[in-house]
């Protein structure tokens, strides 16, 4: 059975993440999908990073009734920096009977050659590339083991836009898997942004 690994900040998770996860388990060989939240992303603004436990809890609540999905908090147990190759090696040791596929957006595919040990990633794991607005992927030139899924849903919602809009007091109940989480996210964001003493 092929298990998809969906890495990300999920800061916060939104309906676009779930629509893509649903598509992948229905229209590709992936039968299980594991969300792997990153405790810290060195490429992103950490000032607006919701607490790791809260991000994991929001994902867990959103997927709790769907047996195809689960949350893996493995990166909080691994030393920093959190390179994908290290996490995948750890998962392969913990789950030796699983076949893993790494899910990456077309935006990340453009810079994939700069990822740590990207050749080893491609040699050992299947890569499934999903579309992102503004990024083209020529699937005729993809290496063996890489696949571009043209028809995956593109819901152009970003976690950044959600955070900004929540802080502006906008009602985003239909953008979030759990409409009631908007107040929790707003409170956590205000704590993140308040001056530390």
UniProtKB/Swiss-Prot annotation:
It comes from the Bacteria. One of its GO terms (biological process) is NAD biosynthetic process. Keywords: ATP-binding, NAD, Nucleotide-binding, Nucleotidyltransferase, Pyridine nucleotide biosynthesis, Transferase. Pathway: Cofactor biosynthesis; NAD(+) biosynthesis; deamido-NAD(+) from nicotinate D-ribonucleotide: step 1/1. Its EC number is 2.7.7.18. CDD domains: NMNAT (cd02165). GO terms for molecular function: ATP binding; nicotinate-nucleotide adenylyltransferase activity. Coiled coil: none annotated. Pfam families: CTP_transf_like (PF01467). Belongs to the NadD family. PANTHER family: NICOTINATE-NUCLEOTIDE ADENYLYLTRANSFERASE-RELATED, PHOSPHOPANTETHEINE ADENYLYLTRANSFERASE. This is Probable nicotinate-nucleotide adenylyltransferase.
């Amino acid at each position: 059975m092929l298990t998809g690994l969906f890495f990300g900040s999920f800061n916060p998770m939104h309906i676009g993440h779930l629509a893509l996860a649903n598509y992948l388990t229905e229209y590709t060989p992936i039968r299980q999908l594991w969300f792997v939240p990153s405790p810290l992303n060195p490429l992103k603004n950490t000032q607006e990073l919701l607490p790791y436990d809260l991000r994991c809890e929001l994902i867990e609540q959103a997927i709790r009734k769907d047996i195809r999905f689960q949350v893996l908090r493995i990166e909080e147990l691994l030393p920093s920096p959190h390179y994908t190759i290290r996490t995948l090696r750890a998962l392969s040791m913990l789950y030796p009977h699983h076949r893993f596929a790494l899910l990456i957006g077309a935006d990340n595919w453009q810079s994939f050659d700069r990822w740590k040990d990207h050749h080893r990633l491609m040699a050992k794991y299947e890569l499934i590339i999903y579309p992102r607005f503004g990024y083209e992927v020529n699937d005729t030139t993809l290496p063996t083991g890489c696949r571009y899924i043209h028809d995956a849903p593109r819901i152009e919602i970003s976690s950044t836009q959600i955070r900004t809009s929540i802080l502006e007091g906008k009602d985003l109940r239909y953008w979030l898997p759990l409409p009631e989480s908007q107040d929790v996210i707003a409170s956590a964001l205000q704590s993140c942004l308040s001056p530390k003493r």
